[in-house]
Amino acid sequence: MIRTENLCKIYHLINNNANISRARLAGITNLSKTTVSSLVDELIRGGYVVDCGTEARAHQGRRPNALQVDGDSNVVAVISWRRARLDLALVSSDGRVAFRDRLPLNEQSDGTDRVADAFFRRLLPAAGGARVMGVCIIIPGIVNEEQRSIYSTVIGVDPGDPVIERLSEALARY
């Protein structure tokens, strides 16, 4: 559990501090250089981080290797469900929008089915060889977490419709 927390901490520090070195990570986290190197190596092997080689420095001495998140290999699928359309995007782990598209919705279509269809038929193919690290579905409305339903929304979902459960089931095979 502690190792997982430290992995997350190291990943977030690399994500927020492009070209950071292992030594700097050790200084910020108060972890040993050996521990930091082990954690960074695990993130590199997992394909989440890349070692960009030595960074340019003004002073002499050994130049540390710069680390960055691997935005080319990792994306998050984002679907924003609007009244008349779905806005689709793939956002790389380093914050770049790698793909963007729009799909119209008509009043007769089941939005839940369209969301799942957009994910499997548009976003996954657009991701190519990149790993889809997660799916973010934006639904404008008030969510009842206990019942996994929506109280109020502008997208035409009836109150009490278990849309969250239906989306979970529709995307479960991923």
Regions found by a protein language model. Give the residues of each.
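Glycine-rich phosphate-binding loop and adjoining helix at the ATP-binding site
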Residues: 101-174
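N-terminal helix-turn-helix
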Residues: 19-51
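Gly/Thr-rich phosphate-binding beta-strand-loop-beta motif of the actin/hexokinase/Hsp70
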Residues: 61-100
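Short, cationic-aromatic polyanion-contact patches
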Residues: 1-6, 21, 54-73
